[in-house]
Amino acid sequence: MSYPIERVRADFPLLASEVNGQPLAYLDSAASAQKPQSVIEREAEFYRHEYAAVHRGIHTLSAQATSAMEAVREQVAAFINAASVEEIVFVRGTTEAINLVANSYGRTFIQPGDNLIITEMEHHANIVPWQMLAEARGVEVRVLPLAEDGSLDVAQLPGLLDERTRLLAVTQISNVLGALNPVKTMIAQAKAVGAVTLVDGAQSIMHQTVDVQDLDCDFFVFSGHKIYGPSGIGVLYGKRDLLQAMPPWEGGGAMIRQVSLRTGTTYADSPWRFEAGSPNTGGIMGLGAALDYVTALGREEIQRYESSLMKYALEALKQVPDLTLYGPAERHGVIAFNLGQHHAYDVGSFLDRYGIAIRTGHHCAMPLMEHYGVPSMCRASLAVYTTREEIDRLVAGLQRIHRLLGS
């Protein structure tokens, strides 16, 4: 059965928009994906008819809202094949999840003189928290570099690992290059020296089937808005025993067991000890609807369609003169490029006139820009609703810019 692209596009109301008098070609889903009507309606329905503060409420609405929220926690656990619902922490997004691990696990278990490993292709969210930890704790940050083809030079990882390595933090798919990293192998190597592992799944969650038990990672993080859900909601997966050993990062309501001015405070078990304050319940409902949508469409079907579309796009882009592509030959979800000597901002501005939305800049990956010796790149990204016709429009737009501006 062929992929139902027209039906899928009809599920996303914003895709019917026009920009600058042109039909919108939205090629910026790696930054944030559009939302299907089912997600929009689920969040609105919750606020219209179901909303109440969760936890500890004895009235019916509160109990129902709490049950609905915990049902989504169970849904997330099943979606990534976590061993227990208690391994799922709701956060604002990937950035908060990584900061939580850095500030809770990192400041407790990583000592002066220890080291941790990141890679040259990480998003700033998986660099800066570790740099901050290193500065505060006297920890060394080691960097796994890129190979010449734009993939990670994983052959160098064993040489970076030693008995003082406490953590490996790596993206599963680069938000710039689209490289799919061999994280399962890297995790096994890190565990051999006793290090814990964190996988940034912000990009992979919308393109790959994720099985955290198969990966055997200690932490896995992602954002809802990348997988067609609302903004402001994300997930930290952590192995239960590890989460239970970690102290809370933030204090407040909901994360306590007992508070006393005389004897101090004791904390709830995980995951609730990491969920201080009122949660984004509407966002959680929307996240559940987004996972329902992806599951109904079929993750294997999505992967097949997007793989075919990526091959088509890479072949079509060969028609553009003076186009430089960045990254390995096999990539997932994103295509990074520059056109001649033109600044990415100028290329993106011209494409916007034609109704084509791409992302330009350093993509929160300045070390990667430094590696390639450029200040910025253009990035087109694919999603479940992207069409070959939109790829053709991108190619035609780039050809037109080249004719107008030269190389």
UniProtKB/Swiss-Prot annotation:
Pfam families: Aminotran_5. Gene3D superfamilies: Aspartate Aminotransferase, domain 1, Type I PLP-dependent aspartate aminotransferase-like (Major domain). The keyword Transport does not apply. The keyword Zinc-finger does not apply. The modification N6-(pyridoxal phosphate)lysine is found at K226. It comes from the Bacteria. The active site is at C364 (cysteine persulfide intermediate). One of its GO terms (biological process) is cysteine metabolic process. It catalyses: (sulfur carrier)-H + L-cysteine = (sulfur carrier)-SH + L-alanine; L-selenocysteine + AH2 = hydrogenselenide + L-alanine + A + H(+). PROSITE patterns: AA_TRANSFER_CLASS_5. One of its GO terms (cellular component) is cytoplasm. One of its GO terms (molecular function) is cysteine desulfurase activity. Its cofactor is pyridoxal 5'-phosphate. Belongs to the class-V pyridoxal-phosphate-dependent aminotransferase family. Csd subfamily. Cysteine desulfurases mobilize the sulfur from L-cysteine to yield L-alanine, an essential step in sulfur metabolism for biosynthesis of a variety of sulfur-containing biomolecules. Component of the suf operon, which is activated and required under specific conditions such as oxidative stress and iron limitation. Acts as a potent selenocysteine lyase in vitro, that mobilizes selenium from L-selenocysteine. Selenocysteine lyase activity is however unsure in vivo. Homodimer. Interacts with SufE and the SufBCD complex composed of SufB, SufC and SufD. The interaction with SufE is required to mediate the direct transfer of the sulfur atom from the S-sulfanylcysteine. This is Cysteine desulfurase. It comes from Pectobacterium carotovorum subsp. carotovorum (strain PC1). The gene is sufS.
